[in-house]
Amino acid sequence: MHLIIPDSYDPKLSVKDTQRAIRYIRETFQDEFGAQLNLSRLSAPMFVEKSTGLNDNLNGIEQPVSFTMQDMGDSQIEIVHSLAKWKRVALKRYGFNLHEGLYTNMNAIRKDEDLDNFHSAYVDQWDWEKVITKEERTLDTLKQTVRQIFKVIKHMEHEVWYKFPEAVHHLPDKIHFITTQELEDRFPDLTPRERENAITKELGCVFLMQIGGALKSGKRHDGRAPDYDDWQLNGDILFWYEPLKQAIEISSMGIRVDAESMQRQLKIADAEDRLSLPYHQMVLHEEVPFTIGGGIGQSRLCMLLLGKAHVGEVQAALWPQAMIDQCEAANIHLL
């Protein structure tokens, strides 16, 4: 557990008005986001069978919540960490065409999450995925899509200002692009998290690219599962968040692996045993479309747009009593 208490925190909205604002942001954003990227809303599962290989393994150390079901025999069922792989299969299953895509309201439990102002065991995000061609698996495609997403987020600042002018947190006008290697070259003596804070404070908003593989130092900037993002074609959208004087990650996204990049990354991750799983076989034999996709944090977006000090102000979850007490003493009202 780690908690940042901002100086003299004064929430601009009551708990009741905050709830109204959350609903407005969620409903407005998903409509504009879907229209901008040509995405249709789909219903999505809260749990999948472990044997399918569809769950997100995150960094490889987080354990999903699992259980059995009365009518499913000995099959292990897992609550999703995310829908990164499920979405790609869904695009095939439901017959989406080139440059069409889907988004879902994804709810997940990450029981091993380190809790702080930004991180909760309960994850709510818009998980999205879009069909592209093999030739479009490029940095240009990635950057163009990032700019589209940034455009919608920036427009949401104005939408929120119209409805809740006293609460809106102002966002930068431009997003900048930088790779993890460029960041390490520039700030070799800082930790990865410190580098993110330094560059985001300087530029306001950045898309940090190429996360997952080893840098020249031999270290990774951060971990990424080896079987959905191509580590050379992915990244995080980060905003400088002045209320907490830190960078806040709003989205993790990327162009998805093809057979070659998946095999290479699974070998690096010492996880080649996954190649026999149904999802991985579909990627190997090009039985699922080439795609780009990611997740956009719903609660984090609300937190960013409303200038909140803790994600627990915009979502109902469980927190240690010590964190609850410290927040109450600092005028931070957790739901």
Curated annotation (Swiss-Prot):
Subcellular location: Cytoplasm
GO biological process, alphabetically ordered: L-asparagine biosynthetic process
EC number from the UniProt entry: 6.3.1.1
Entry keyword set: Amino-acid biosynthesis, Asparagine biosynthesis, ATP-binding, Cytoplasm, Ligase, Nucleotide-binding
Chief location of this protein within or outside the cell: cytoplasm
InterPro entries per UniProt: aa-tRNA-synth_II (IPR006195), aa-tRNA-synth_II/BPL/LPL (IPR045864), AsnA (IPR004618)
Entry keyword rRNA processing: no
CC terms in the record's Gene Ontology section: cytosol
Catalytic activities: L-aspartate + NH4(+) + ATP = L-asparagine + AMP + diphosphate + H(+)
GO molecular function: aspartate-ammonia ligase activity; ATP binding; catalytic activity, acting on a protein; transferase activity
Pathway(s) this gene product operates in, as recorded in its UniProt entry: Amino-acid biosynthesis; L-asparagine biosynthesis; L-asparagine from L-aspartate (ammonia route): step 1/1
Family under the similarity heading: Belongs to the class-II aminoacyl-tRNA synthetase family. AsnA subfamily.
UniProt name for this protein: Aspartate--ammonia ligase
Gene symbol of the encoding locus: asnA
